[in-house]
């Protein structure tokens, strides 16, 4: 009887202690995630100190030049990944300190020695730990067009966008300034009506209101709202769910090396019908934090110009601000405020929750 009593007491103690242990472990993982995001923020600052600008959100070239890299490449030398940065094949003669030509991990053009093919080998099985939140339940490295590459738990923030009154299903939303355009950020965004990859991404809205935007180099001087009032990085480190409650990974399908195939700035792009508008590793804020619906316009697991911020942390996500600090923002954060915090020059009063 005494033995049974002891066993029962031990069982009760384990039941009481286990949640505390799990909470402590998650607190440690969240702290590690915060440190990662601080390192990335410091990397952005050091890049700016070296080149007087932040890296472009993504770079792209002509159809023959193929896919460029996202801003992650520019950060590599500043997050203890100098060796990887030096091994990446440089094509296209970019400006010093900026992205290495146009060819990312894909679009090798069918040539065995093209930069795309060579970089696929360079990036293969290289784990970039700073890109991964320890709380993220998804596989940190997985196959991307034949290479095993890191899929970041974090994403660059292009800006914030509002919705217009769309027309019939499948009809492109109005362009900036056109009839029917009610987007208050209309001077700093473009539509992503891409002929490629279909789905809800065809009603995506891409912004250029932040500092990590396509084919454009922006710096502190452009952040007129103040660096403590601009989000530059957010989390995408948890599963989404489709209408059947199946788990869906919305980190994109090509991992950290993938940028864009477009050479234009967002504000000069025309309607994308017949073109490929994809920009990987970036999102424009359109939906509340913690939104996990995969059927909303602009969301997708190939790429999603409006994929929402999500994390495995309870109640919200961590974000990196342009001043390098990291803040936790809850799922209940006011959406209009979140969009303004994604915009470098909104001219409005912002108060972080």
Predicted feature locations:
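Internal low-complexity, small-residue/proline-rich segments
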Residues: 23-353
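N-terminal single-pass transmembrane signal-anchor helix
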Residues: 1-29, 33, 39
């Amino acid at each position: 009887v005494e033995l049974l009593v002891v066993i029962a007491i031990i069982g009760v103690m384990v039941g009481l202690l286990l949640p505390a242990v799990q909470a402590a472990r998650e607190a440690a993982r969240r702290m590690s995630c915060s440190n990662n995001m601080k390192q990335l923020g410091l990397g952005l600052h050091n890049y700016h100190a070296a080149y007087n600008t932040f890296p472009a959100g993504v770079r792209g070239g002509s159809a023959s030049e193929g896919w460029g890299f996202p801003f992650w490449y520019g950060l590599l030398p500043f997050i203890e990944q100098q060796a990887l940065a030096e091994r990446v094949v440089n094509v296209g003669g970019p400006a010093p300190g900026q992205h290495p030509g146009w060819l990312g991990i894909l679009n090798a053009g069918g040539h065995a020695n093209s930069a795309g093919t060579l970089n696929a080998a360079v990036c293969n099985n290289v784990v970039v730990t700073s890109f991964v939140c320890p709380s993220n339940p998804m596989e940190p490295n997985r196959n991307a067009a034949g290479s095993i590459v890191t899929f970041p738990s974090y994403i660059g923030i292009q800006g914030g966008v509002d919705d217009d009154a769309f027309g019939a299903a499948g009809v492109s939303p109005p362009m900036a300034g056109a009839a029917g355009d009610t987007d208050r950020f209309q001077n700093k965004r473009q539509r992503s009506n891409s002929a490629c990859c279909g789905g809800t991404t065809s009603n995506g809205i891409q912004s250029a209101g932040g500092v990590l935007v396509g084919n454009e180099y922006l710096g502190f001087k452009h952040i007129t709202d103040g660096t403590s009032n601009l989000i530059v990085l957010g989390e995408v480190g948890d599963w989404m769910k489709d209408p059947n409650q199946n788990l869906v990974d919305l980190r994109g399908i090509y991992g950290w090396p993938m940028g864009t195939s477009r050479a234009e700035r967002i504000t000069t792009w025309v309607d994308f019908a017949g073109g490929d508008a994809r920009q990987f590793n970036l999102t424009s804020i359109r939906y509340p934090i913690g939104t996990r619906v995969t059927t909303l316009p602009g969301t997708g697991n190939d790429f999603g110009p409006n994929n929402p911020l999500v994390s495995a942390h309870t109640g919200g996500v961590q974000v990196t601000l342009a001043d390098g600090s990291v803040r936790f923002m809850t799922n209940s954060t006011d959406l209009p405020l979140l969009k303004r915090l994604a915009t470098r020059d909104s001219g409005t009063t912002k108060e972080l929750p």
